[in-house]
């Protein structure tokens, strides 16, 4: 299986670096947690965490912040993985947001993301008093993530200050925090999207089938192909879902995630597309286009 991937050594180096980071954090922090958003990066992150502590169990829980607007397949896949690998899975929903009926159609992507994702995440971190949170973000995804450290320091309000980051020389990480402070940890910072796909293929990692092309009901809005995942999505006048062969490069709340037209329904075909693509995987994420520098603003407020 591995012979068709030219940079296996490179992938093994990335794997070793990520495993080292997992073990460092587990040894240095009192109460770590792994953020599990169910996408391809989370699937690789889970695989790496299991490798880091094999043959034992992962020594920290997984946290999924459920906005109630994820693709149904993502939730089913999440529960399937939790059962299969005997994971300590925590699911948190911002009940205040649910009570206010916050949703992306009425309130827009920015408010929905802030209340159901950012506030929801901070609620969970405060509730369980986690001092370190693993995430699957990579530097190649987006410009604000490109300048974030592996150990990303957060103050007592979970805020990130991009102008006040700690140096990381020779893979030496500064884990010193005061009471109430925390860090976000990104073991896959140095991976690329292509690395992720090649590693998924090499290690035979399970992922949601949303990443593979098949006919799906979509409508075109603001230049994005939005999949009609359930009856809650209001159709505009004259709008009719049509079946198109599409897949997703990134996953989030279904009303805020654009599909790409594709016929790639196997991992080798997806990898071939990655070799030829000229666009960012996050071009289909509505939340990244709320305003200029919106991702950095969200992260400064406590976003993933």
Curated annotation (Swiss-Prot):
Catalytic activity: sulfate + ATP + H(+) = adenosine 5'-phosphosulfate + diphosphate
Subunit structure: Heterodimer composed of CysD, the smaller subunit, and CysN.
UniProt protein name: Sulfate adenylyltransferase subunit 2
Family membership noted in the UniProt record: Belongs to the PAPS reductase family. CysD subfamily.
Record's keyword terms, sorted: ATP-binding, Nucleotide-binding, Nucleotidyltransferase, Transferase
A biological process from GO: sulfate assimilation
Source taxon at top rank: Bacteria
Pathway of action: Sulfur metabolism; hydrogen sulfide biosynthesis; sulfite from sulfate: step 1/3
KW Transferase (keyword) present: yes
Protein task: With CysN forms the ATP sulfurylase (ATPS) that catalyzes the adenylation of sulfate producing adenosine 5'-phosphosulfate (APS) and diphosphate, the first enzymatic step in sulfur assimilation pathway. APS synthesis involves the formation of a high-energy phosphoric-sulfuric acid anhydride bond driven by GTP hydrolysis by CysN coupled to ATP hydrolysis by CysD.
Keyword ATP-binding: yes
UniProt-listed HAMAP family: Sulf_adenylyltr_sub2 (MF_00064)
GO molecular function, one term: sulfate adenylyltransferase (ATP) activity
Enzyme Commission number, as recorded: 2.7.7.4
